[in-house]
């Protein structure tokens, strides 16, 4: 138990160092020509704030290309009404999904194919993301300043209700386990973190890696794309997007269970075992009177507090960190079972 507590304490210290080193985009202008790419499938209920924020971007020369990927809820008509003939915007109809492709990579590849050939940077945005007016310019400017090929500013994650137990684990995971400054310069694919909610990619690097065609069957296509870039000599990583973007991925616990279910089966079993050993076993031991277990629990909570304070997350939820990790492991187990049964789907498409 003392070893587990010591490792958890070391990881909390690592998260603290990462939090201090995490790059922060600043409000500025960008000189590159940019294509902002927005894939949509049945997003009529949430796309309006995202779209209005994109149309209000400042400090950057951009075009906005929107793909309606077979929506059945009027998404395309709503988008056309909202853009109201804005010359910066093109709205496309998605083509049928080819064999061997998943929906998100196919939509993104179509968007890139339709982007202006003069665009130097591709910025992918999800429909549940609302950007600050300077977000695109600040992202592209930092991409250039870092002389890197992919930059993913991690948005602030709004987490209502019970989703607060799991959603903050996104930022906590890479702050805790990934050496960020090393990862952003390393070409080792294993040192990769990215988030397709907001992601800027240098077009030359994207093309060299094979684009989304190189990750056409990947459920976690954002991280897979960065790994493909690294395998072809590029670099990239994450930065703090708290002041640039906010996203609310799920409105309820049931939505979160379905959403996480489509991808958590990809987590290796050894990873889940390590998480349980480090963050679930010590607090259980603490309840049985173990001082080392109590220290291990405190270390886990400390790491979560560091992450929450750095990324605008809920600090009080950090106290329930063992519950959060246990729930993550259960969700991963459910996802694995559904994947084995061939029962996973997302927005009407099998995964």
Feature annotation, model-predicted:
Residues 1-30, 168-171, 176-180, 321, ...:
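N-terminal membrane-anchoring/stem segments of glycan-assembly enzymes
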Residues 32-35, 63:
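Cell-envelope/extracellular polymer assembly enzymes that use nucleotide-activated donors
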Residues 68-78, 95-96:
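A conserved acidic beta->alpha catalytic loop
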Residues 108, 122:
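Short aromatic/hydrophobic "clamp" motif used to bind/position activated sugar donors
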């Amino acid at each position: 138990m003392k070893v587990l507590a010591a490792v958890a304490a070391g990881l909390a210290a690592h998260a603290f160092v990462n939090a201090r080193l995490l790059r922060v985009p600043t409000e500025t202008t960008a000189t590159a020509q940019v294509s902002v790419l927005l894939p949509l499938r049945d997003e009529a209920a949430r796309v309006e704030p995202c779209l209005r924020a994109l149309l209000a971007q400042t400090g950057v020369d951009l075009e906005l290309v929107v793909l309606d990927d077979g929506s059945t809820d009027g998404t395309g008509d709503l988008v056309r009404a909202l853009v109201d003939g804005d010359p910066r915007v093109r709205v496309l109809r998605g083509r049928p999904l080819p064999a061997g492709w998943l929906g998100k990579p196919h939509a993104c590849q179509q968007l890139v194919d339709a982007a202006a050939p003069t665009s130097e940077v591709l910025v992918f945005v999800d429909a549940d993301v609302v950007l600050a007016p300077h977000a695109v310019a600040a992202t592209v400017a930092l991409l250039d300043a870092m002389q890197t090929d992919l930059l993913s500013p991690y948005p602030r994650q709004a987490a209502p209700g019970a989703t607060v137990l799991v959603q903050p684990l996104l930022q906590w995971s890479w702050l805790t386990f990934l050496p960020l400054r090393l990862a952003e310069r390393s070409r080792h694919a294993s040192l990769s973190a990215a988030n397709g909610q907001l992601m800027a990619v240098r077009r030359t690097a994207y093309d060299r890696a094979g684009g989304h065609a190189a990750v056409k069957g990947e459920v976690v296509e954002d991280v897979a794309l960065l790994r493909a870039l690294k395998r072809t000599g590029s670099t990239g990583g994450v930065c703090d997007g708290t002041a640039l973007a906010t996203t609310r991925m799920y409105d309820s616990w049931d939505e979160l269970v379905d959403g996480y279910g489509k991808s958590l089966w990809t987590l290796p079993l050894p990873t889940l075992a390590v998480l349980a050993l480090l963050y679930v076993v010590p607090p259980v031991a603490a309840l049985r009177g173990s001082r080392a277990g109590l220290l291990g629990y405190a270390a886990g909570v400390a790491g979560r507090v560091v992450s929450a304070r750095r990324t605008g997350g809920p600090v009080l939820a950090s106290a329930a960190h063992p519950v959060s990790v246990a729930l993550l492991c259960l969700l991963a187990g459910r996802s694995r079972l559904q994947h084995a049964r061939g029962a996973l789907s997302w927005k009407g498409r099998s995964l």
